[in-house]
From Swiss-Prot:
InterPro entries: DNA_mismatch_repair_MutS (IPR005748), DNA_mismatch_repair_MutS-lik_N (IPR007695), DNA_mismatch_repair_MutS/MSH (IPR017261), DNA_mismatch_repair_MutS_C (IPR000432), DNA_mismatch_repair_MutS_clamp (IPR007861), DNA_mismatch_repair_MutS_core (IPR007696), DNA_mismatch_repair_MutS_N (IPR016151), DNA_mismatch_repair_MutS_sf (IPR036187). This is DNA mismatch repair protein MutS. One of its GO terms (cellular component) is cytosol. GO terms for biological process: mismatch repair. NCBIfam families: mutS1 (TIGR01070), PRK05399.1 (NF003810).
Amino acid sequence: MNAPASPAVQTYDATGATPVMQQFFEMKARHPDALIFFRMGDFYELFFDDAYKAAAALGISQTFRGTHNGQPIPMAGVPQHAAEAYLSKLIRLGFKVAVCEQMEDPAEARKRGSKSVVRRDIVRVVTPGTLTEDGLLDARGANRLAAVAIRAGQAAVAAVELSTGEVECFLVAKDAVGAILAALAPSETLVADRLLSDDLLAQTLKICGGLIQPMPSALSEPQASETRVKRLYGVDTLDGFGGLSAAEIGALGLIAAHLEMTQAGKLPALRAPRRAAEADVMSIDPATRSSLEIDRAQNGDRSGSLLAAIDRTVTAGGARMLASRLARPLLDPHAIDARLDAVEWFVDHRGLRERLREVLKGAGDMARALSRLALGRGGPRDLGCLKDGLKTGEKLAGMVGGSGDPLSPPPAQLEGALKALTPSLQEGLSRLLAQLETGLGPDLPALARDGGYVAAGVRPELDQARALRDDSRRVVAALESRLIQESGVPLKIRHNGVLGYFVEATAGKADPLFQPPLNATFIHRQTLANQVRFTTVELADLDARIAQAAERALAMEVAAFEDWRAEAVALAEPIQLAAEALAKLDVAAALAEWAEDAGAVRPSVDKSLAFEARAARHPVVEAAVKRAGDPYTPNDCCLDAAGERGARLSIVTGPNMAGKSTFLRQNAILAILAQSGCYVPAKSLRLGVIDRLFSRVGAGDDLARGRSTFMMEMVETAAILTQASPRSLVILDEIGRGTATYDGLAIAWACAEALHDTNRCRALFATHYHELATLETRLAHVSNLSLRAKEWNGDLVFLHEAAAGPADRSYGVQVAKLAGVPPAVVARAKEVLDRLESKTESPARLDDLPLFASHAPGPLNQFGAPVQAAPSRTDAALGDLDVDGMSPREALDALYRLKALLKT
């Protein structure tokens, strides 16, 4: 996502501007590349170019208000109460928005003089990676801000989820940046502007999506970065973070600089960086991630993805944790087993699991509530969310810890979660929970300034102020009734922050209030399109008395809110740990629930090079097939890069529509599930950990870069052949199909040989080039698999069974018939096929040709070129023959001599 194209940033001459417009010009000068949401009463107004852009993007009216230097001022506005929806749309369109708030109410400004202007300031700059409001976020999805830095050839990717406080650092090789960013899926990525001159890195950033935000390179320099990171965390040294590298500090420094600019000095409650290396998680490049539809289907929707198929979580935090695990499968079998132990425990304790999931539904999103409170954007509902979450944790700690089964105690991962949730071990959390339970009322507003959220009886002085305020409100109701009776006009007494209390009548009914004698009582204040507003001396006096009582009550409520907010922020770390613990319990229980529903089993994950799946199924396809009422056909797959318990490379053949692509994806998905710590839909799975997963299944044109489908296919194939290791898993579908038949066959043949001989990885190679089946007899660790189909009464029936051995034909004409190709075309295709097959019959087999003979690489010289072998005696004798100068008799004698040499 990139910001909409716009002309160069416009500069403004503030000479002669009104005091309010001078404020706008000052804010615009500070943030020239952002739209300024300028608060004026109940609206956010936009002026000049901002008004034109916002009106076009949001579909709102653009008008004019006043003049500046003799020219009308373009203006557009959105109501304050609906601002989140408009902000969300602008951010999705790629705009940056600076929110300029009123820092005082008009009454306070008037105390400084009748002509004083309300103070305003930028309270935040909204960008895609810095969203925290529920209305702007997907509750079940992460929203990350990432940064990339490179130092001395080493790359680092840092990511922060501002809405939860999570921070991560990855130290990787430069060519692995794309895989890490694809796993993180950031909404916004910061990068030093000098790095964008690297075409490869720039293209990698583009492929990974999100807004790319260039930053001045100086911001990623080591010394400046270290200073900013220390300031961000409020520490004097970074030693406590475990010896961060220069690249990691540079990436974190970019994030710190961006947060300083966008959060207007407010420090978020961030956790210490979690550090990971390239060797800690399975590498999955963007193309593979897309083709396997891990968290999004090809159309961009969550529905139809692997995540959607297995997600049974009941909390927002649990949903985000599950998505993160699927995006970054682990490489350490011990860490994988720890996750699987937690899932297995809930599989074995079904009754407890069901009760736990029911209780979890009452937990709020504590992590995001805490972040908003820390940034000064939270409200009473966020305190209520903390209360509900801590109360839920307290219940779960007793429920799981007291499961009463001494023979099957909770595994280590669940024990750790329970400790984070046990109030007796977290004295501060216990105290905060007690305060919130007694202090918060039942109906909580979104904003602290709305009042009404402190429970009665908690603060006696607040109860007294409320009583006076509420008595005054009854007086207002009585005054309204009397004014209606005296005037004969159906009016209402209303209130807003600008006018205070006022009398409002519809425009059609207000005329008597302008006429004697009523005009002596009713003083005109404001005329709107459909209403007219007035005041009276009595109402103004009452307004002052109510305001004083209401102000006192609200001030006391806000003070109580600030006390609780400060207490919560001071306890940020244990609250974050408690939120993480709830998410872990939710994920483990949810995966157990899915495992039971799907008939999934616990995989065995080790450090071998094996891949042994028995009766495996594709979870997404199986769910779709079951919805249609059809059975799903499971299949086996056995690979072993060491060649001990299975083939290293399986050539997969079979008709179109027989299920080759599904079979390939199915086995890749099994690996992702297993290494993420999930059960797998199969009878059994033994998996040697996979370091990199590559998929070349389907491709499309990249017209913007002048790349055809075939070129894209070759680019992806090149990446696989240069990066796959013996511990990798590769799935390839129809390599070479986008070019001429023999070109494609030659490329497919050579790629298969390279995977077997050079990469030596586990690989599934689906193809319609049946000639590749002969590799089974020519290479040591190749097997053939075919997806079966049979003809029945002239129709083709797909069995979706993977069987040993190659397919005998592709049945392309029959598939064309099934697709609805006109019968005449099908008949003609059959006729042409018969002719081609009869003409190409030859006693010579394809694998007898030198091109397709199995390649055994010989010795290489110092330049890497093959060393030419010395000519044989037969070759030398053949080279000495003067064919043109020989008589028939001499030629016959030479032939006998050559034959004799061959026998020696």
